[in-house]
C-alpha cells in the first residue's frame, strides 16, 4: 500500500461503533437534544458534535468518521426507534415477544431515555401499573374500614346530634365517593408535578452541561495561548543564541587575524637604543 493512499471508512456502522456512539451521545445528550434553536445553541451543538467525533475517533477498533457521519447515524437510530415504538404501541405487543425490537433496535430503553419528551406519547407506561394497584389497594382497605364503620353504626345506633346544629351526618357511601374522587384527582396532580420536576431537572442539567462545555473551551483556549507563548519564547531564544554564536565566531576570527599580524614573539624583542 502506498503512503499517499487514503483509507476510506467503512460504509456501515458496526454494533460496537453504534454502542460507542450511543455512550458518547448519552454523555452530551443535554446539549445535543436541547430544543433551543438560537444561533448560540446551534453553534454549541456543532462544537459538541466535533468534540464527540474527536472522542469517537480516539477509541480503538473504530473507523474514522467525521461529526456529520456520526450525527446522521444518530438521527437514523432515533427515527428507527420512534417508528418501532409507535408500532409497539399500536400493536400492543409485549416487549419480550417482539422479534422486531430484538433484531433492529439497539438499546431501545437507553435511546428512549435520551428523548423523554419526544417519546412521551409513544412508549407504553409500565410505571403507572404499581400506582394503580396501590390506589386500588388503598381504596379496598378504605372500603373495608367503611363497612366496619357502618356495622358499628348499625350496632350502636346513630350518634346523638348536638343541639343548635342542623347539619346531616354523611353516610358511608358519600364518604366512599368523596375518598374515591380524592384518589382520582390526586394521581393526575402527582403525575403533572412529577413531569414538571423532571423537565426542570433536565433544563438544569442542560444548563450545567453547557457551562461545562464553555469552561472546557475557555480552558482549551488558555492552553493553546500558553503553548503559542512558549513557542514564541523558544523561537526568540533560538534567534538570540544564533546572534551570540555569530558574534562569538566573528570575534574568534578577528582574534586569529590579529594574532597572525601581530605574533606574540614580536612583543618580546628589545626596543632599539635611542641615539
From Swiss-Prot:
Positions carrying Phosphoserine are 96, 98, 274
Report which superkingdom the organism of origin falls in. Eukaryota
Q: Which InterPro entries match?
A: Myb_DNA-bind_5 (IPR028002)
Q: The Myb-like domain covers which part of the protein?
A: 13-78
Q: Carries keyword Signal?
A: no
Q: Where is this cross-link: Glycyl lysine isopeptide (Lys-Gly) (interchain with G-Cter in SUMO2)?
A: 154
Q: Name one Pfam family in it.
A: Myb_DNA-bind_5
Which first-to-last residue range defines the signal peptide? none
Keyword set, alphabetical order: Coiled coil, Isopeptide bond, Phosphoprotein, Ubl conjugation
Residue ranges the record marks as coiled coil: 211-247
Q: Which family does it belong to?
A: Belongs to the MSANTD3 family.
Identify this protein by name.
Myb/SANT-like DNA-binding domain-containing protein 3
Q: What species does this protein belong to?
A: Mus musculus
Q: What is the lineage of its organism?
A: Eukaryota, Metazoa, Chordata, Craniata, Vertebrata
